[in-house]
Amino acid sequence: MEHKTKLIVRGGGDLASGVIHRLYRCGYQVLVLECRKPSAIRRKVSFGEAVFDGISSVEGVTGRLIEDVSECQKVWEAGEIPILVDETGKVIKELRPDALIDAILAKRNLGTTREMAPLTVALGPGFEAGKDVDFVIETQRGHNLGRVIRKGSATPNTGIPGVIAGYGKERVIHSPAAGIMHNLSQIGDIVEKDQIIAMVDATPVYASLTGVLRGIIRDGYEVPKGMKIADIDPRKEQKKNCDTVSDKARCIAGSVVEVLLANGVLP
């Protein structure tokens, strides 16, 4: 049987999904490993939402939740992307991927090692290229976004979002209390500054600025105080882009493909 290049991507959030989408379009067979309760904000472009809904779609590409790694082939043959809940990566040895991409973006290493695959790549800070993984991709907005790092680490997490239309930290909303999310606004809605967009139990969540609600954690999600729960884009004209892969994700995805091709991992 002809060998098809198999890749594992750890993580199914919006940046990870930009990478997954690009790899799929390039002809790779991709398995996505997710956690039990994904906390994606940009849910319309996150394959990990399949963990809750059984199925997800990003720009016409379908992700499908599976219960066992043995189901991968059937899903691949259907032209879809299998998504498996596996927080520790225990199926990696069983599948023996040609390459592994850590796209969890936890700002720290949650257990990925170079021994997991012939080629290993990690996105963002928390990894040292040449030690923890073979390559690291810079994820911080700015001149070096998407840079392939062969030795050393990505820029440490500053906790300050990249500036868009003059707004940085104001774009991101954190939970004012611990509790259950009750969303009053939906992704793509135009919201006004100080508008109540959600409730965390009885505590209101206010829009930090006027713009388009680019993302909000799913309704019913239990959040701790201080957790990132929403993202507002001050550019109202970006409403049409809430359900498409971002420029940042596409840039990072291109760098991952560069690493694969440069190291002989062809589709």
Walk through the language-model features, giving the residues of each.
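Well-ordered secondary-structure scaffolds
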Residues: E2-P267
